[in-house]
């Protein structure tokens, strides 16, 4: 069964019926411990049986929300491209809806997952281009911007979760090699936090040196309050932690160099890592001049960036200038019930704080669920002011049950 792919946004016909069906189900939130345990003792057939349904549920939940975006955004070429990618992937996975779990079917499924992963490799950049096209064509009103911000947080954390399922399955039960023999899929049961911090710092420093011809140094302090004197390790997805640290180091270095100048002695970036009974806490402190509270609120907005817009000829690093670095990093932190936030002192510097669950059984996926509440948040019009002045938000933390 194949559906027509004529600019499917909003999705129509038989595809819409399947979306309606699968969006009635809530996604199954897994813990890192569950991922780890299944990777060690699960079978390819059981993983296939779970994934062929769960991927359709997660896709359907977010695709239904996609149809509620402002019509002007859905008409942008890049947005249409993304909607078509999702429709095509949903169709591809529907082919396995009623199939058995024979080794031949599992092998075909693995091949299809690889195709889907490659198809969605540039979803973030392409969706960002859609927003740029919208701004350049007609602008965005405040009500639409709030709805878009709400959707994109959910859309990207949904994408993180889907890629986690796919990569974990393909590494454990497919032909994709793990990063190291110790890894269970994408998960490191004993992730060396200090090593990830240094890798992220050195790579960010390389970019800073190449662009500014100088860079600040780092002072790192580690404190293990659980096993005193021992190195800090946790069960984690190292690539997620690296993504967050690399982004925060880039921001701290850029702010430090631009505030103090390339000819001055640059103050160190100070990093504190503490492992407690419940949390792994990381704080990155720079003396890059900080930002005002007005700007601080906007740093998580997908339609705002402190950098110039990226060139469209591919000469700049992906995401540079899109304004996606911080909001995406926050989603990586929140994905397993952690968090990321900034505290800034204008005229001095900024502290960036990351919290991750130190206990893997408590690190549950935070997943968007298509519901009456999500429909209302995506479609509500301008709100009548009930304060004399704008009241700053409290970090826009996701609701927890």
UniProtKB/Swiss-Prot annotation:
Q: Which InterPro entries match?
A: AK/P_DHK_N_sf, BCDHK/PDK_N, BCKD/PDK, HATPase_C_sf, His_kinase_dom
Q: Does the record's keyword annotation contain Membrane?
A: no
Molecular function GO terms recorded: ATP binding; pyruvate dehydrogenase (acetyl-transferring) kinase activity
Q: Which domain of life is it from?
A: Eukaryota
Q: Which family does it belong to?
A: Belongs to the PDK/BCKDK protein kinase family.
What's the Enzyme Commission number for this chain?
2.7.11.2
Q: Which SUPFAM superfamilies match?
A: alpha-ketoacid dehydrogenase kinase, N-terminal domain, ATPase domain of HSP90 chaperone/DNA topoisomerase II/histidine kinase
What is the gene called?
Answer: pdhk-2
Which terms in the GO cellular component ontology are assigned? cytoplasm; mitochondrial matrix; mitochondrion; perinuclear region of cytoplasm
From the Swiss-Prot or TrEMBL record, give the protein name. Probable [pyruvate dehydrogenase (acetyl-transferring)] kinase, mitochondrial
**Protein location:** Mitochondrion matrix
Q: What class of enzyme is it?
A: transferase
Q: Which organism is it from?
A: Caenorhabditis elegans
Gene Ontology process terms (BP): regulation of acetyl-CoA biosynthetic process from pyruvate; regulation of glucose metabolic process
Q: Which transformation does this protein catalyse, written as a reaction?
A: L-seryl-[pyruvate dehydrogenase E1 alpha subunit] + ATP = O-phospho-L-seryl-[pyruvate dehydrogenase E1 alpha subunit] + ADP + H(+)
Q: Name one Pfam family in it.
A: BCDHK_Adom3
Which positions in this protein are listed as binding ATP?
A: 247-254, 286, 305-306, 321-326
Q: Null mutant: what phenotype?
A: RNAi-mediated knockdown increases lifespan.
Q: What does this protein do?
A: Inhibits the mitochondrial pyruvate dehydrogenase complex by phosphorylation of the E1 alpha subunit, thus contributing to the regulation of glucose metabolism. Required for normal lifespan.
Where does the record place the Histidine kinase domain?
A: 131-360
